Amino acid sequence: MPNQEKMEKAIYQFLEALGENPDREGLKDTPKRVAKMYIEMFSGLNQDPKEQFTAVFSENHEEVVIVKDIPFYSMCEHHLVPFYGKAHIAYLPNDGRVTGLSKLARAFEVASKRPQLQERLTAQVAQALEDALAPKGIFVMIEAEHMCMTMRGIKKPGSKTITTVARGLYKDDRYERQEILSLIQKG
């Protein structure tokens, strides 16, 4: 579990190291506010995304299931600044095994609430879905803007990073993969 007191002390010292006075009016409560914010932002650290798939049903459904345009934010583990965007999750049920639609978004939320890399986030969500449902195919796509590319370094606001993970049928069958991409890209 996060140690809020230790975080507050570290943030206080960080402000001092910047040459700021952490005791001045505008900064006096900043260590506490920042620590609380990071505890919230990293709330997925002690959770497993696959544990979000608590509702699994046997339905007579053998066609693709897609939840798209899931808004999210996460924190780049290299710079501890946000990246944000939208995720698309698709799977092809195996033997009619489906999950509640909200469970896909919940699993994604848990995986995103930790210091993260977009590539790893994409793979973790795909793995959680594979572990929970063993579907015939999985396709996860994330489109995100990274503040580490917008605010510092190269300074290219508006640039997007797209990552994908395809498993099973969507990895092996080019036609099936193209169909998923087409469905995701439809307005």
Swiss-Prot record:
Binding site for Zn(2+): C76, H79, C148
Entry keywords, A to Z: GTP-binding, Hydrolase, Metal-binding, Nucleotide-binding, One-carbon metabolism, Zinc
Database matches in CDD domains: GTP_cyclohydro1
Coiled coil ranges: none
EC identifiers of the protein: 3.5.4.16
GO biological process assignments: one-carbon metabolic process; tetrahydrobiopterin biosynthetic process; tetrahydrofolate biosynthetic process
Designated name of the protein: GTP cyclohydrolase 1
PANTHER family the record matches: GTP CYCLOHYDROLASE 1, GTP CYCLOHYDROLASE I
InterPro entries xref list: GTP-CH-I_C/QueF (IPR043133), GTP-CH-I_N (IPR043134), GTP_CycHdrlase_I (IPR001474), GTP_CycHdrlase_I_CS (IPR018234), GTP_CycHdrlase_I_dom (IPR020602)
Cellular component, GO, one term: cytoplasm
HAMAP family (alphabetical): FolE
Top-level taxon in the UniProt lineage: Bacteria
SUPFAM superfamilies assigned to the protein according to its UniProt record, in alphabetical order: Tetrahydrobiopterin biosynthesis enzymes-like
Protein source organism: Streptococcus agalactiae serotype III (strain NEM316)
Enzyme class (EC, first level): hydrolase
Catalyzed reactions: GTP + H2O = 7,8-dihydroneopterin 3'-triphosphate + formate + H(+)
Listed GO MF terms: GTP binding; GTP cyclohydrolase I activity; zinc ion binding
One Pfam family recorded for the sequence: GTP_cyclohydroI
Family assignment from sequence similarity: Belongs to the GTP cyclohydrolase I family.
Gene: folE
Binding partners and assembly: Toroid-shaped homodecamer, composed of two pentamers of five dimers.
Pathway annotation from the record: Cofactor biosynthesis; 7,8-dihydroneopterin triphosphate biosynthesis; 7,8-dihydroneopterin triphosphate from GTP: step 1/1
Record-linked NCBIfam families: folE (TIGR00063), PRK09347.1-2 (NF006825), PRK09347.1-3 (NF006826)
